[in-house]
Amino acid sequence: MIHTATLIHDDVLDEATMRRHLDTVNARWDNEASVLLGDYLLAHSLCLTSSLDDLYAVRELSSSARTICDGELRQIESRGNFDLREDQYVSIIGNKTAELLACCCRLGAYYAGAEPQIREALDRYGHHLGVAFQIADDVLDLLGDEQTVGKSLGTDLLKQKCTLPLIRLLNRVSACERPELLDLLAASDNHRREALRPWFARFDAIEYARGQAEKFARLATEELHLLPPSPALDSLRELTRFVVQRRQ
């Protein structure tokens, strides 16, 4: 429910019109309805968790919601900052995206009665998985097909978000070519996404980003070594593979 709320709010921020092959809430109604619906879902999720026998879930979800908002605010602040470093980008998506997955893993482990060591390992698993997911998602935003992916694409460029492929490109482009690239990034041309593809290919920016996504996926898988063999463990490993291989 919290995840759905963040997606509704994300679509407002990105001015997206399609999500999961359907019109977004803001496209079908308006931004006001979207903000209120997202807020309602957040509030309702906290109401549900507060009805549990202990306060662990409500504490964890409240803390994660705050961290996610911090990540979103930092991303907004970094728009148009084409000097953003890779470690800063990873820190932002660690809050914006990875925190929610880490929280889900913490909650699942806690309510399953797992030992603290396993809960901590699954927390790290969720974090690494979330970073891998976001990097792969940022690649899809640049190269994916909207009908296949099922959501609005190119919004990162539209909002001048400096994602990992772009950071890699900016780090590798020569000083004499950098002004041309920055002019292209600043343009309002609807075909900017296509115009940038040769740049990404020339400097292996997409392959680098995919490699980093796979690195974080491997880190996630390594955190599962404490878990005994089970269908649940198989599902977590399969989920990790899916995150970096998905095309939608």
Predicted segments with their positions:
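All-alpha prenyltransferase/terpene-synthase fold signal
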Residues: 1-248
